[in-house]
Amino acid sequence: MIAHEFPIHYIEPVFRPPSEAHSLILPVTNGCSWNRCGFCEMYTQPQKKFRARDEAEVLEEIRRCGERLIVKRVFLADGDALVLPTRRLLVVLEAIRRHLPEVERVSSSYCLPRNLRRKSVDELRELADAGLRMAYVGAESGDDEVLARVNKGETYASTLDALEKLGEAGISRSVMILNGLGGMTLSAQHADNSARLMNAAQPEYLSTLVVSFPTGEQRFRAGFADFEALDRRALFVEVERLLQGLELEDTVFRSDHASNYLVLKGELGADKARLLAEVRQAIEQPQHAALRQEWQRGL
């Protein structure tokens, strides 16, 4: 190995949440085990075909990182690290503890509820005890009609079950909702039922992202032919409706992903009134709101 090479081999593109900007990205899988969601283009390239990475290769990369890097946080990639058997995940987590003793938090990538539900609460507790502190879950919507239209392969009930399992196991949950996913026709029910799902789950973290199609809408419209995209104002109205419906006790809320026009940050429920006021200003007086321009959205 050339001395200046980074200790980890990546198959591009590699994705991470905004909050993992300073984490070591450690791929334990390549691609997504489902990869059928109509809205998602992240893992559609041929080189991102799903597979579990070789265990020995991953362990060697962890060892090399321990020799060269000081690491505080680790993010397990790619599309859904928790699809791996619990035994394999425990081996990886143990290696992180051994070779990267400064690590304070290990997070798992965009977990599919279907794969979380295959693990028992006891298995998830084992992972938590071994150092897994957070799981990112792309709920996308709490509305069954929207989920079916976009071929998510999940329902309100299946997503709630997965989130409750994680919570019972002591793993923090960071949940993503896709602003605009239901289009104009399903916008209201998308917002209402997403709020209902979050109220039932009470996740530790919640974020909204704007649905977007950098390479075109053909894949998406295969299952949602009458989709009518929300304009910027309608996106804000939908976020406002979502926030109005949320009854959260202690959840960190963020809309700081590159796709968002309006960046929102606060605690729910403490900051609910302030967040709603910021959204209302974006609706009524966009010229006075700190909105991102199209070129700033990085899509």
Regions found by a protein language model. Give the residues of each.
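Conserved SAM/AdoMet-binding glycine-rich loop
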Residues: 65-168, 247
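A short acidic, helix-capping loop that chelates divalent metal ions and anchors anionic groups
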Residues: 48, 144-149, 217-218, 262-264
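Canonical Radical SAM [4Fe-4S] cluster-binding loop centered on the CxxxCxxC motif
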Residues: 12-57
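Catalytic cores of alpha/beta
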Residues: 119-123, 182-200
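Conserved strand-turn element in the central/C-terminal portion of the radical SAM core barrel
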Residues: 114, 142-146, 166-190, 209-216, ...
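Auxiliary Fe-S-binding modules of radical SAM enzymes
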Residues: 1-20, 196-299
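Hydrophobic faces of well-ordered beta-strands that scaffold small-molecule active sites
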Residues: 24-26, 74, 105-109, 135-137, ...
